[in-house]
From Swiss-Prot:
Region: Disordered, residue numbers: 1-51, 78-109, 157-189, 235-271, 392-457, 500-540
Zinc finger (C2H2-type): 112-134, 140-162, 192-214, 220-242, 275-297, 303-325, 331-353, 359-381, 451-473, 479-501, 543-565, 571-593
Regions of compositional bias (Low complexity) in chain numbering: 415-432
Originating species: Homo sapiens (Human)
Record-given protein name: Zinc finger protein 48
Compositional bias ranges of the Basic and acidic residues kind: 1-22, 39-51
Length: 618
């Protein structure tokens, strides 16, 4: 029996660490044979001990529990006991069995904990990398563009974008074992859902970041100015403003949009948004945000609203749109408590409390709190040729004659002759080569109103205005009041109506806006006539009728009252053509044209009176 143990015993240690007499001192007899537990059964291969399982003698019984030495509770503890010492030796670098942790690896009782957020790690190196997310340290710099990274592996991945290297190739199906598919979460299932707004996320970390928009928590502080941020990436972008750094430009060349399209994007923060949309000129910080935005210009829109039928390219846009119908406003202002349906609207509102004006005009150094206000202001500095379209150069504007004196009417111009059928054109408006072909309508200019109402022929510049106007003819009111159930055709009308439930009054206009003459640039042929608004009599009823002096709390009530003086009746009945000054009066009138079918006869629907004879009802 001892002959069978001798070939295996010396192979337990490497040649330079071989101790022939060690088995006698530790109590290992000739009958004690070391064997691996059943859970470590694997294919014969060389492991950390330096031998193979197939090298064992064929007459050994592997897995006999009776052969375990005395005092050894686990087979993994065999190699750490040295000559009566019952604990591992820290400086030992000998072989280790399977399942034994490496030296220097933190165990459960020696976990490395971050002092900022309390997150724990098994190794100190992982804690050092994690702390760079709090300090913003980026010691690894790219040699091509100079971009910094907190981890060396991130820099290696980034450098492949410059070199074009693709080291990972797909393995042919014939080589290697079959690939086992991982269990992934289906695209339609998102387990993490926000309890405030109902938005779903794929990862719990994204839900934690999103919930900070509701709670206002900002754990990441700037070390220079102390400003807080809810995301570490937002703090990194903010710190570029202190260091004067600019983000790297995209490698793919992009077509520069026109000056009119990028008028509002050339402010002081334009350098932080290198990705530009070629369709509308909007800038973005991340390329993924640009790709998500371009879906709104082209591609299908699978997300449709069940209330008004409007379609969206992203589900998040549909969630925001549904708040218009439900009146939900989950984003509250911490200063005044006002609610907003969108987080960006709350950010713009907070500027009214802080007085921040981040958008500056490069022409006159005037600052604005909104980018849309800056865009309208910059149009006053631009020349007419800046509004030309590709293929349709805009000629010099013909100076208009001075207006007639007050009290006189302008002279009537004769009618133009009938159209002969030839293409109509103006000098200087011939399309350039490469422009739109013949027969295609030119794009609408700034003063055109291409969207016409088929009922009354009124024109609008935007299609959304036409949709709102068309509700006047159809009587549709998709915006319902959650308190009393009253419907409104416009969301702003519902907002004004909600003030009556809360006991609020309409705000009077500030004194600075009552008299504001318009001074256009350039020489003025005659002094403009200022428009004088009616002075409000008090803060509770600012709207006064100019005919009889009656006061109203809302401007809509004043508009309805003026129709009693002017005789205007814009709401026409589709059956008899009778006009009404109020839409509610027309609805009451139209009920007289309908007759209800008794229960059990027909389909039970309301029909016009002209169909009464056909139904056989008296």
């Amino acid at each position: 029996m001892e002959r069978a143990v001798e070939p295996w015993g010396p192979d337990l240690h490497r040649p330079e660490e071989r101790e022939p007499q060690r088995g006698a001192r530790t109590g290992l007899g000739s009958e004690n044979v070391i064997s691996q537990p059943n859970e470590f059964e694997h294919t014969p291969q060389e492991d950390d001990l330096g031998f193979k399982e197939e090298d064992l003698a064929p007459d050994h019984e592997v897995g006999n529990a009776s052969l375990k030495p005395e005092g050894i509770q686990n087979w993994d503890d065999l190699w750490v006991q040295r000559e009566g010492l019952g604990k591992p030796q820290p400086r030992d670098r000998g072989p280790r069995l399977l399942g034994e942790p490496r030296w220097g690896q933190a165990s459960s009782d020696r976990a490395a904990v971050c002092g900022e957020c309390g997150k724990s790690f098994r190794q100190m190196s992982d804690l050092v990398k994690h702390q760079r997310t709090h300090t913003g340290e980026k010691p690894y710099k790219c040699g091509v563009c100079g971009k910094g990274f907190g981890d060396s592996s991130a820099r290696i991945k980034h450098q492949r974008t410059h070199s074009g290297e693709k080291p990972y190739r797909a393995r042919p199906p014939a080589q290697g074992p079959p690939k086992i598919p991982r269990s992934r979460i289906p695209a339609g299932e998102r387990p993490t859902i926000c309890g405030e707004c109902g938005k779903s996320f794929r990862q719990s970390s994204d839900l934690v970041k999103h919930q900070r928009t509701h709670t206002g928590e900002k754990p990441y502080k700037c070390g220079i100015c102390g400003k807080g941020f809810g995301d570490s990436s937002a703090r990194i972008k903010h710190q570029r403003t202190h260091r004067g750094e600019q983000p790297p430009r995209p490698v793919v060349p992009r077509r520069q949009p026109s000056r009119a399209a990028t008028a509002a994007t050339q402010g002081p923060k334009a350098q932080d948004k290198p990705y530009i949309c070629t369709d509308c000129g909007k800038r973005f910080v991340l390329s993924c945000s640009l790709l998500s935005h371009q879906r709104s210009h082209l591609g299908p829109k699978p997300f449709g609203c069940d209330v008004c039928g409007k379609e969206f390219a992203r589900g998040s846009d549909l969630v925001k749109h549904l708040r218009v119908h439900t009146g939900e406003k989950p984003y509250l202002c911490p200063e005044c408590g006002k609610g907003f349906a969108d987080s960006s609207a709350r950010v713009k509102h907070l500027r009214t409390h802080s007085g921040e004006r981040p958008h500056a005009c490069p022409e006159c150094d005037r600052t604005f709190s909104l980018s849309s206000t800056l865009l309208r202001h910059r149009l006053t500095h631009m020349e007419p040729q800046d509004f030309s379209f590709p293929g349709y150069p805009l000629p010099a504007l013909i100076p208009s004659p001075p207006p007639p004196p007050l009290g006189t009417s302008p002279p009537l111009t004769p009618r133009s002759p009938s159209h002969s059928g030839e293409p109509f054109g103006l000098p200087g408006l011939e399309p350039e080569p490469g422009g739109p072909q013949a027969g295609e309508p030119p794009p609408p200019l700034a003063g055109d109103k291409p969207h016409k109402c088929p009922e009354c022929g009124k024109g609008f510049r935007r299609s959304s205005d036409l949709v709102k106007h068309h509700r006047v003819h159809t009587g549709e009111k998709p915006y319902l009041c959650p308190e009393c159930g009253k419907g409104f055709a416009d969301s702003s009308a519902r907002v004004k109506h909600l003030r009556t439930h809360r006991g609020e009054r309409a705000r009077p206009p500030p004194p600075s806006t009552l008299l504001r003459p318009h001074n256009p640039p350039g020489p003025v042929p005659m002094a403009p006539r200022p428009r004088v608004r009616a002075q409000p009599s008090g803060p509770s009823q600012p709207h006064v009728c100019g005919f009889c002096g009656k006061e109203f709390p809302r401007s809509s009530d004043l508009v309805k009252h003026r129709r009693t003086h002017t005789g205007e009746k814009p709401y026409k009945c589709a059956e008899c053509g009778k006009g009404f000054g109020d839409s509610s009066a027309r609805i009451k009138h139209q009920r007289g044209h309908l007759v209800l079918t008794p229960f059990g006869i027909g389909d039970g629907r309301a029909r016009p009176l002209k169909q009464e004879a056909a139904t056989g009802l008296e």
